[in-house]
Amino acid sequence: MTAQVLDGKATAAAIREELKERVAALRARGVVPGLGTILVGDDPGSHAYVRGKHRDCAEVGIASIRKDLPADATQADVEAAVAELNADPACTGFIVQLPLPRGLDENRVLEKIDPAKDADGLHPSNLGKLVLMEEAPLPCTPRGIVELLNRYGVSLRGAEVVVVGRGVTVGRPLGLLLTRRSENATVTLCHTGTRDLAAHTRRADIVVAAAGVPGLITKDMVSPGAVVLDVGVTRTEKGLVGDVAPDVAEVAGYLSPNPGGVGPMTRAMLLTNVVEAAERSLS
């Protein structure tokens, strides 16, 4: 068996085409969605991510607002940039590119974001609304995972899903998304401290690997025909490495690779959050 690839690049491209039409409709009504970014420091990876986000904006017609701060920016400098974007009517939503340089309090910065402009869906208020199943911007990577599965016709209703990773950006909120009535999956949240991880993953219909441990999920840990999504990212001397070993493709029914799987979907959902915020402003 060779797994069918869940192609995040192609799916994200299709979503951007759909967003072009929605943005054109907004512009026709005098509303220009704007995405802001706050980037602190000189990390090449962070700069590449931000450039990619603004390329996406240009493609679909979303205005770009960049605030680049030096590596020695203080906590007050970063919070001032957040306050400026909170107050800027041209900014529909914005993100603070993480990680921030050492010495800066990321949580405090994120808490300063206006929840209505939280394009990443990671403000504590919005995560709380997700728990309460109230409408709010959704975390981009978990939303991208669900959207990718839906677009390939992978049924979530009643599915046994094992999520490996307990981070705030993926693991924890993904479980909340998957257990909504609209998805109705049954979720087991595992992590690097889980005893006999393979026993959990082998019984899963869907495995989402988001622990940040290279090669954590191997083919003997996956049931034949299961759906596997590789979301973990670790920087090594050889480049970015995911959590799923290459041999998993021999047994899985579907595989979302890394790179090229969930990453492009995360960026597409960022744009979607901004467009939806602009649409809400008209209602």
Curated annotation (Swiss-Prot):
<keyword id="KW-0521">NADP</keyword>
<dbReference type="GO" id="GO:0009086">
    <property type="term" value="P:methionine biosynthetic process"/>
</dbReference>
<keyword id="KW-0368">Histidine biosynthesis</keyword>
<dbReference type="InterPro" id="IPR046346">
    <property type="entry name" value="Aminoacid_DH-like_N_sf"/>
</dbReference>
<dbReference type="Pfam" id="PF00763">
    <property type="entry name" value="THF_DHG_CYH"/>
</dbReference>
<dbReference type="Pfam" id="PF02882">
    <property type="entry name" value="THF_DHG_CYH_C"/>
</dbReference>
<dbReference type="InterPro" id="IPR000672">
    <property type="entry name" value="THF_DH/CycHdrlase"/>
</dbReference>
<feature type="binding site">
    <location>
        <position position="192"/>
    </location>
    <ligand>
        <name>NADP(+)</name>
    </ligand>
</feature>
<feature type="binding site">
    <location>
        <position position="233"/>
    </location>
    <ligand>
        <name>NADP(+)</name>
    </ligand>
</feature>
<dbReference type="GO" id="GO:0004477">
    <property type="term" value="F:methenyltetrahydrofolate cyclohydrolase activity"/>
</dbReference>
<comment type="subunit">
    <text>Homodimer.</text>
</comment>
<dbReference type="InterPro" id="IPR020631">
    <property type="entry name" value="THF_DH/CycHdrlase_NAD-bd_dom"/>
</dbReference>
<comment type="pathway">
    <text>One-carbon metabolism; tetrahydrofolate interconversion.</text>
</comment>
<dbReference type="GO" id="GO:0000105">
    <property type="term" value="P:L-histidine biosynthetic process"/>
</dbReference>
<keyword id="KW-0028">Amino-acid biosynthesis</keyword>
<dbReference type="GO" id="GO:0004488">
    <property type="term" value="F:methylenetetrahydrofolate dehydrogenase (NADP+) activity"/>
</dbReference>
<dbReference type="InterPro" id="IPR020630">
    <property type="entry name" value="THF_DH/CycHdrlase_cat_dom"/>
</dbReference>
<dbReference type="GO" id="GO:0035999">
    <property type="term" value="P:tetrahydrofolate interconversion"/>
</dbReference>
<keyword id="KW-0554">One-carbon metabolism</keyword>
<keyword id="KW-0658">Purine biosynthesis</keyword>
<keyword id="KW-0378">Hydrolase</keyword>
<dbReference type="GO" id="GO:0006164">
    <property type="term" value="P:purine nucleotide biosynthetic process"/>
</dbReference>
<feature type="binding site">
    <location>
        <begin position="165"/>
        <end position="167"/>
    </location>
    <ligand>
        <name>NADP(+)</name>
    </ligand>
</feature>
<keyword id="KW-0486">Methionine biosynthesis</keyword>
<keyword id="KW-0560">Oxidoreductase</keyword>
<comment type="function">
    <text>Catalyzes the oxidation of 5,10-methylenetetrahydrofolate to 5,10-methenyltetrahydrofolate and then the hydrolysis of 5,10-methenyltetrahydrofolate to 10-formyltetrahydrofolate.</text>
</comment>
<protein>
    <recommendedName>
        <fullName>Bifunctional protein FolD</fullName>
        <ecNumber>1.5.1.5</ecNumber>
        <ecNumber>3.5.4.9</ecNumber>
    </recommendedName>
</protein>
<dbReference type="InterPro" id="IPR036291">
    <property type="entry name" value="NAD(P)-bd_dom_sf"/>
</dbReference>
<keyword id="KW-0511">Multifunctional enzyme</keyword>
<comment type="similarity">
    <text>Belongs to the tetrahydrofolate dehydrogenase/cyclohydrolase family.</text>
</comment>
<dbReference type="GO" id="GO:0005829">
    <property type="term" value="C:cytosol"/>
</dbReference>
